[in-house]
Amino acid sequence: GSPAWADAIRMLVQSSPLAGSQYYAVGRVWPELKPGDRLELVREADNRHDRHAVRVDWRGQPLGYVPRAENRAVARALDAGERLEGRVSRLRDDPDPWRRVEFDILLVL
Protein backbone atom coordinates (compact mmCIF):
# COMPACT_ATOMS: atom_id res chain seq x y z
CA GLY A 1 0.00 0.00 0.00
CA SER A 2 0.95 3.66 -0.01
CA PRO A 3 2.98 5.02 2.90
CA ALA A 4 0.86 6.29 5.79
CA TRP A 5 2.19 9.85 5.54
CA ALA A 6 0.85 10.15 2.00
CA ASP A 7 -2.69 9.84 3.35
CA ALA A 8 -2.27 12.42 6.13
CA ILE A 9 -4.04 15.76 6.02
CA ARG A 10 -1.75 18.77 6.36
CA MET A 11 -2.95 22.17 7.55
CA LEU A 12 -0.91 25.33 6.97
CA VAL A 13 0.17 26.87 10.28
CA GLN A 14 2.39 29.69 8.98
CA SER A 15 4.77 30.76 6.23
CA SER A 16 8.13 32.16 7.28
CA PRO A 17 11.49 33.28 5.95
CA LEU A 18 14.40 31.09 7.03
CA ALA A 19 16.38 32.85 9.79
CA GLY A 20 20.12 32.49 10.32
CA SER A 21 20.74 30.67 7.05
CA GLN A 22 23.97 32.58 6.47
CA TYR A 23 25.53 30.54 9.32
CA TYR A 24 24.49 27.13 7.99
CA ALA A 25 24.55 24.87 4.93
CA VAL A 26 22.21 26.80 2.61
CA GLY A 27 25.01 27.94 0.30
CA ARG A 28 26.39 24.42 0.02
CA VAL A 29 23.03 22.73 -0.64
CA TRP A 30 21.47 25.60 -2.64
CA PRO A 31 21.83 23.81 -6.03
CA GLU A 32 19.90 20.80 -4.66
CA LEU A 33 17.14 22.66 -2.76
CA LYS A 34 13.77 22.70 -4.49
CA PRO A 35 10.31 24.13 -3.72
CA GLY A 36 8.24 21.39 -2.13
CA ASP A 37 11.21 19.78 -0.37
CA ARG A 38 10.38 18.48 3.09
CA LEU A 39 12.05 20.16 6.07
CA GLU A 40 12.38 18.76 9.57
CA LEU A 41 11.56 21.07 12.49
CA VAL A 42 13.85 20.34 15.44
CA ARG A 43 13.05 21.82 18.85
CA GLU A 44 16.07 23.29 20.67
CA ALA A 45 14.70 23.89 24.17
CA ASP A 46 18.25 24.26 25.54
CA ASN A 47 19.26 26.94 23.01
CA ARG A 48 20.90 29.67 25.10
CA HIS A 49 19.98 32.45 22.67
CA ASP A 50 16.27 31.63 22.44
CA ARG A 51 14.33 29.17 24.60
CA HIS A 52 11.67 28.86 21.87
CA ALA A 53 14.25 27.98 19.19
CA VAL A 54 13.14 25.66 16.39
CA ARG A 55 15.88 24.57 13.99
CA VAL A 56 15.06 23.82 10.35
CA ASP A 57 16.88 20.81 8.82
CA TRP A 58 16.97 19.54 5.24
CA ARG A 59 18.09 15.92 4.73
CA GLY A 60 19.71 15.97 8.17
CA GLN A 61 21.60 19.23 7.59
CA PRO A 62 20.76 22.35 9.61
CA LEU A 63 19.70 25.21 7.31
CA GLY A 64 18.64 27.82 9.88
CA TYR A 65 15.76 28.58 12.22
CA VAL A 66 12.12 29.56 12.42
CA PRO A 67 12.38 33.36 12.99
CA ARG A 68 12.37 34.31 16.68
CA ALA A 69 9.36 36.60 16.21
CA GLU A 70 7.34 33.68 14.79
CA ASN A 71 8.56 30.63 16.72
CA ARG A 72 6.63 30.65 20.02
CA ALA A 73 3.46 28.84 18.83
CA VAL A 74 5.55 26.37 16.81
CA ALA A 75 7.73 25.60 19.85
CA ARG A 76 4.65 25.10 22.04
CA ALA A 77 3.05 22.76 19.49
CA LEU A 78 6.23 20.67 19.20
CA ASP A 79 6.55 20.56 23.01
CA ALA A 80 2.94 19.31 23.19
CA GLY A 81 3.78 16.46 20.80
CA GLU A 82 2.03 17.86 17.72
CA ARG A 83 3.35 16.62 14.37
CA LEU A 84 4.68 19.59 12.43
CA GLU A 85 6.74 19.58 9.29
CA GLY A 86 8.21 22.19 7.01
CA ARG A 87 8.14 22.51 3.22
CA VAL A 88 10.24 24.81 1.06
CA SER A 89 7.73 27.21 -0.51
CA ARG A 90 9.97 29.68 -2.35
CA LEU A 91 13.62 30.01 -3.29
CA ARG A 92 15.18 33.27 -4.48
CA ASP A 93 18.78 33.87 -5.43
CA ASP A 94 18.86 37.04 -3.34
CA PRO A 95 21.90 38.61 -1.63
CA ASP A 96 19.75 39.16 1.48
CA PRO A 97 19.78 35.82 3.38
CA TRP A 98 16.35 36.60 4.87
CA ARG A 99 14.85 36.61 1.36
CA ARG A 100 16.50 33.46 -0.05
CA VAL A 101 14.38 30.68 1.47
CA GLU A 102 10.72 30.83 2.46
CA PHE A 103 9.01 27.83 3.97
CA ASP A 104 5.60 26.69 5.16
CA ILE A 105 4.99 25.02 8.51
CA LEU A 106 2.30 22.36 8.33
CA LEU A 107 0.37 20.54 11.04
CA VAL A 108 0.02 16.86 10.17
CA LEU A 109 -3.44 15.64 11.19
Q: Where are the predicted features?
A:
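Conserved active-site motif detector
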Residues: G1-L109
